[in-house]
């Protein structure tokens, strides 16, 4: 009996060890629209301390609505997140946009856990003629991780224009096809402020979006989610993965991170940080 109990104890201990090992090998991926992130916000220490806490929650995070032509605000953010120890590196797009209003896509990542393999900006047509598809074309990045089931995974970020959300979300299907042809991979995550809900995408409009109608795409942040800090209830921010990528996703780990509640902030301060909550998922 004692031998049996000892064996069972060993089995349970081994199971716990493997579970903890599995969790320690997971990556937390996030996407956060930090409203108008530029020098004004970067000069506010109160807001930057909150943003730093949010960013350091993640191993890889996409930051959107980066209004930073000379990357001075980005460098300020890097100084904050690396203050205690130099853990994070970044890769950033060029300023993107068909008009004088431009934004960057910014990825921060823990260099001890992941590295950038390659990147490119999707070519959606000539902006001068107004024939381009996206207001802010995706800046596609492939990351490599030694500790996850999917070693190399590709992130396709998108911050849609609200009034063009249906068209731009549908066009993401073409971006996926381009990534597959260019890099011979189908381990793909689409993420960002899709404006995919409430009045911007509703009813029959969903049937016009191929990454929704094609069931080889999995919407991990559902229509029931609320990604807005204000009183509205809208699932604007999303994470969508391909079937192949699902093998690297921790089941039921995708969620909205409510930093207002978690950091015990009043709503006006939370709104000063952003009008969006981050969305996240664990990769293992």
UniProtKB/Swiss-Prot annotation:
Q: Work out whether the entry's keyword set contains Protein transport.
A: no
Keywords, A to Z, come to: Calcium, Cytoplasmic vesicle, Disulfide bond, Endonuclease, Glycoprotein, Hydrolase, Nuclease, Nucleus, Secreted, Signal
Reactions catalysed according to its record: Endonucleolytic cleavage to 5'-phosphodinucleotide and 5'-phosphooligonucleotide end-products
**At which residues is there a site annotated Involved in actin-binding?**
92
Q: Which Pfam families match?
A: Exo_endo_phos
Keyword Transferase assigned: no
Regarding pH, the record states: Optimum pH is 8.5.
Look up the domain of life of the source.
Eukaryota
Active site per the UniProt annotation: 103, 159
- How many cofactors are bound and how? Divalent metal cations. Prefers Ca(2+) or Mg(2+) which have a synergistic effect on activation.
GO molecular function (one):
deoxyribonuclease I activity
Glycosylated residue positions: 44
Q: What is its EC number?
A: 3.1.21.1
* Subcellular compartments: Secreted; Zymogen granule; Nucleus envelope
Give any Gene Ontology cellular component.
Answer: zymogen granule
Q: Which GO terms describe its biological process?
A: DNA catabolic process; neutrophil activation involved in immune response; regulation of acute inflammatory response; regulation of neutrophil mediated cytotoxicity
Instruction: Summarize the subunit comment.
Output: Monomer.
Q: What the protein does?
A: Serum endocuclease secreted into body fluids by a wide variety of exocrine and endocrine organs. Expressed by non-hematopoietic tissues and preferentially cleaves protein-free DNA. Among other functions, seems to be involved in cell death by apoptosis. Binds specifically to G-actin and blocks actin polymerization. Preferentially attacks double-stranded DNA and produces oligonucleotides with 5'-phospho and 3'-hydroxy termini.
Regarding protein family, the annotation reads: Belongs to the DNase I family.
The protein, known as? Deoxyribonuclease-1
Q: Which gene encodes it?
A: dnase1
């Amino acid at each position: 009996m004692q031998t049996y109990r000892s064996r069972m104890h060993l089995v349970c201990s081994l199971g716990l060890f493997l579970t903890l090992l599995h969790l320690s090998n997971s990556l937390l991926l996030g996407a956060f629209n930090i409203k108008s992130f530029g020098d004004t916000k970067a000069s506010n220490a109160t807001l930057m301390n909150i943003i730093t806490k949010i960013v350091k929650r993640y191993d890889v995070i996409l930051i959107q609505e980066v209004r930073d032509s000379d990357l001075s605000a980005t460098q300020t953010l890097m100084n904050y997140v690396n203050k205690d120890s130099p853990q994070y590196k970044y890769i950033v797009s060029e300023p993107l946009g068909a008009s004088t209003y431009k934004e960057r896509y910014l990825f921060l990542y823990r260099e001890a856990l992941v590295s950038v393999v390659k990147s490119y900006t999707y070519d959606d047509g000539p902006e001068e003629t107004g024939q381009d598809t996206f207001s802010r074309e995706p800046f596609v990045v492939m990351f490599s991780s030694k500790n996850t089931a999917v070693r190399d995974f590709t992130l396709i970020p998108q911050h849609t224009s609200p009034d063009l959300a249906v068209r731009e979300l549908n066009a993401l299907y073409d971006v996926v096809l381009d990534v597959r042809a260019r890099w011979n991979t189908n381990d793909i995550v689409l993420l960002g402020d899709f404006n995919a809900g409430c009045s911007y995408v509703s009813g029959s409009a969903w049937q016009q979006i191929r990454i929704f109608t094609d069931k080889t795409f999995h919407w991990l942040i559902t229509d029931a989610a609320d990604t807005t800090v204000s009183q509205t209830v809208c699932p604007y921010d999303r994470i969508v993965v391909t079937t192949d990528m699902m093998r690297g996703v921790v089941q039921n780990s995708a969620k909205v991170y409510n930093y207002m509640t978690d950091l015990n902030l009043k709503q006006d301060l939370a709104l000063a940080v952003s009008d969006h909550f981050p969305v996240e998922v664990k990769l293992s």
